[in-house]
UniProtKB/Swiss-Prot annotation:
EC number annotated for this UniProt entry: 1.14.-.-
Protein's organism: Rickettsia rickettsii (strain Sheila Smith)
Reactions performed catalytically: uridine(34) in tRNA + AH2 + O2 = 5-hydroxyuridine(34) in tRNA + A + H2O
RNA-binding as UniProt keyword: no
Keywords, sorted A to Z: Oxidoreductase, tRNA processing
Function: Catalyzes oxygen-dependent 5-hydroxyuridine (ho5U) modification at position 34 in tRNAs.
Class of the enzyme per the UniProt entry, highest EC level: oxidoreductase
SUPFAM superfamilies xrefs: Rhodanese/Cell cycle control phosphatase
Similarity annotation: Belongs to the TrhO family.
Encoding gene, per UniProt annotation: trhO
Alphabetized NCBIfam families for the sequence: PRK01415.1 (NF002397)
Name listed for the protein in its UniProt record: tRNA uridine(34) hydroxylase
Transmembrane segments: none
Domain of life the protein comes from: Bacteria
Length: 247
């Protein structure tokens, strides 16, 4: 029986002084360990999704942590019968998730986590609004029943949407959701930095929620878009078999 391919996603907002210096080391290790996927590096941290054997993806993660020294890392592992990526890329970026807001300190301004097991109860409270921080083509594939869709084409448009919808957000507990946690974490940082106090986000994102809860209350509708060759996954995280999604 062939070993399943492990797909490891990890991010951390941590200050990296010279991120470019890490690229050769990570490329060399990744290629030696037959890793495929993408790792983004910036002064604000790292964000990666890569595949290989379970042992090897964890070796790469350990090296990434050793090189950057984060206090905490958000990690998610799924499995597939095949590699969902074509090759390994390690790239230097201005931001690990591009929002185009200067001097946003995610470590200093960050919302509170809601654990997947508590999410359904939390978002059904009357004073809570849910915002899906993903792009419109992702939300179209699937989202939570009560979620507001900002209809953004890119995450860079999200700050403008916030500015235009302050009345909608005023006096509410704001719950942010995204695929794996990074966009909702940065979104809560934006809102906290401009004065919103009761800001929350789904720990581990939609993928962790589906794994932990199996969507038992049917608050999630549709499938979850993913940025690899699987294109989308169902509530049990199986790849969607039909190839209807075009970008």
């Amino acid at each position: 029986m062939n070993e399943k391919i492990a797909i490891l996603s990890a991010y951390s907002f941590v200050n990296i002084e010279e991120p470019a210096n890490l690229i050769p080391k990570l490329l060399l290790l990744g290629k030696r360990k037959y890793i495929r996927g993408t790792i983004l590096l910036a002064n604000e941290g790292f964000n990666g999704s890569f595949s290989g054997s379970y042992e090897n993806v964890n070796l790469v993660l350990e090296e990434l942590i050793k090189l950057t020294g984060p206090k905490d890392v958000n990690v998610k592992i799924n499995y597939s019968d095949v590699h969902p990526f074509q090759k390994l890329k390690v790239r230097l970026k201005k931001e690990i998730i591009a929002m185009n807001v200067d001097d946003l300190n995610v470590d200093l301004f960050k919302g509170e986590y809601i654990e997947p097991k508590d999410w359904d109860e939390f978002i059904t409270k009357q004073d809570v609004i849910v915002i899906d921080t993903r792009n419109d083509y992702e939300v179209e594939v699937g989202t939570f029943k009560s979620a507001i869709n900002p209809n953004t084409k890119t995450f860079k448009q999200f700050p403008a949407w916030v500015q235009q919808n302050q009345e909608l957000l005023k006096g509410k507990k704001i719950a942010m959701v995204c695929t794996g946690g990074i966009r909702c974490e940065k979104s809560t940082s934006l809102l906290k930095s401009i004065g919103y106090n009761e800001v929350y986000h789904l720990k581990g994102g939609i993928l962790q929620y589906l794994e932990d809860t199996q969507n038992k209350n049917n608050l999630w509708q549709g499938e979850c878009f993913v940025f690899d060759d699987r294109r989308a996954v169902t509530d049990d995280l199986s790849p969607v078999e039909r190839h209807w999604l075009q970008r």
